[in-house]
Amino acid sequence: MKTLLIHSDYLEFEAKEKTKIAEDADVLSGKMDECLTVFIAVEKDDESDPDAVVKNAVEEIVKTADNLKVKNVVVYPYAHLSSDLGSPATAKEILAEIEKELSGNYEVLRAPFGWYKAFKISCKGHPLSELSRKITTERKEEVKKEKIVSKFYIINGENLELTEVNDEIISKMEDKGLLALLKHELDIKEEGTEKGEPPHVKYIKEKEICDYEPSSDAGHFRWYPKGKLIRDLLSDYVYNLVVERGGMPVETPVMYDLQNNAIREHADKFGERQYRFKQGNKDLMLRFAACFGQFMMKKDMYLLPKHMPLKLYELSTYSFRYEQRGELVGLKRLRAFTMPDMHTVCIDMKQAMEAFEDQLWMGLKTGDDFKTPYAIIFRFTEDFFEENKDWFFGMAKEYKQKYGKDAILEILPGRKHYWVGKVDMAVVDSFGRPIENPTVQIDVESAERFGIVVHDGDKKVHPIILHCSPTGSVERVLCGLLENAYLNTLENKPPALPTWLTPIQARVIPVGDKHEEFALEVANKLRASGIRADFDDREDSMGKKVRNAGTDWVNYVVVIGDNEMETGKLTVTIREESELKKAKKEALTVEELIEKITSDVKDAPKRPLPLPMKCSVQPIFR
């Protein structure tokens, strides 16, 4: 913020003409004698913490007014003080707050924002009569008040006991996943738990899945054919999951105008981790979730109780978060990502709680399907929890029965966010750190902010909205899968992805030239059955071909020699059933192999292999 403070004999103004960004004002003219006139330009940096800039501006104005012994203050918006202006919506709010904060101790006259104004001023002309100040969002160190913080509990779903977390409880916890999540929540760091890059970073490069794009911003990736296939299969999986449960797919823009009050208020709640930029006279942002577009769409819908619960789903390709460069870690923390995002409109809290429970089980199902077990934490405001204890205990009991696990419960003393309740589910990586993926949140604020209403007879009701990502970002899902693959190696198992997600599900390797024709027939039969199979026709030794198949994490490696041609029984190495130093082999007919792979994949999404069938002509991407 830039300010110009003038000790004035008088300031007189008259608003002449509106601009497009003018506020509706009751006071269009005014005069104040013996005053401190404060010309103010609100800048873009002020948007990061409007409360702080208001506080700092008021302190500076009060200090100057007291030094000059004046009790009259004019607040005058004056854009010409800066070439880096903040959004009009933010400026209006900040100016109004400054007026409000000063009004208790001073007579305040505020000129309207966004009008062409005529003004006259008489400066007193003494050494302190003209002062310019740069006001920042820096928060000065305040006297620390006793702060009420969240309380954390372990909930045993068997006997429904809540045990408040303390050092003794932490030392006795046996569930490594739950312990890792709890330590993360309590910000307990242990030396030696992080050494170098997490394994998935090596895997994404080595397996030609994806890599950083050096010509883009940090945290943005290029995706190679194998990685694009995996990401598309994961996207197909979530699409099927939500559509089967009544989700209606939509698509909304990635960019939004911050002059829209609802958009800006929702964006400001997320803090500084945003891509914001100016284009022409517009202040724009890149979305960090699909909330913005879906809420604007719901605002324009004529919603009735019979439509509830109404679920809109979007795979936001992409969402953007301007994470700190030092925090960027592979697929776990990046700046552009693919987020499956469903928002459910509910007529009341009862319906919202029913939907919350359904979506909890949907999220947990994804961990079952990916074979990446979750640790979970419920978070509720104290008031909400006290009113709905029985409902929560019912979920905790069912969770214990289904998964045999306890959960963490966080109780917040009051509502700090737009939600009163949420659940987060996390996979634990090889460093013992949680990768938070699925989430469900009960939003009690956004419907009113965005003007979303349900027409219930003669009444207009602001509904409850659930935010749900059934898997978390697609990139984090893959991160969890790859970290889990590494953890398998610590248990003497070869690293692997689930067969339905592995780019090359089967590879056929002929022992010699005379076996190639038969081997090619086998590969074609596999492909005709919807299996992603390729054919290793490279002029390498048999040992190298088998090792290459292992490096590529091929699930089923088929070797064809004389015996296989004579008997029709193929020698198949099954990766998922093997040990690191001991391959599991079976003799299977082509039909038996097709049946085994089909049974392995079950009803998971299917896509063809986006690479040439012959390994000799498959390009190398890095």
Curated annotation (Swiss-Prot):
Gene3D superfamilies: Anticodon-binding domain, Bira Bifunctional Protein, Domain 2, D-tyrosyl-tRNA(Tyr) deacylase. It is found in: Cytoplasm. This is Threonine--tRNA ligase. Homodimer. The gene is thrS. Its EC number is 6.1.1.3. Catalyzes the attachment of threonine to tRNA(Thr) in a two-step reaction: L-threonine is first activated by ATP to form Thr-AMP and then transferred to the acceptor end of tRNA(Thr). Also edits incorrectly charged L-seryl-tRNA(Thr). It comes from the Archaea. The N-terminal domain is an archaea-specific tRNA-editing domain that hydrolyzes incorrectly charged L-seryl-tRNA(Thr). Catalysis of tRNA editing is performed by the charged tRNA itself. InterPro entries: aa-tRNA-synt_IIb, aa-tRNA-synth_II, aa-tRNA-synth_II/BPL/LPL, Anticodon-bd, Anticodon-bd_dom_sf, DTD-like_sf, Thr-tRNA-ligase_IIa, Threonyl-tRNA_syn_edit_dom_arc. It comes from Methanococcus maripaludis (strain C7 / ATCC BAA-1331). SUPFAM superfamilies: Class II aaRS ABD-related, Class II aaRS and biotin synthetases. Zn(2+) binds at C291, H343, H467. It catalyses: tRNA(Thr) + L-threonine + ATP = L-threonyl-tRNA(Thr) + AMP + diphosphate + H(+). GO terms for molecular function: ATP binding; threonine-tRNA ligase activity; tRNA binding; zinc ion binding. CDD domains: ThrRS_anticodon (cd00860). Its cofactor is Zn(2+). One of its GO terms (cellular component) is cytoplasm. Residues 199-498 are annotated as: Catalytic. One of its GO terms (biological process) is threonyl-tRNA aminoacylation. Binds 1 zinc ion per subunit.
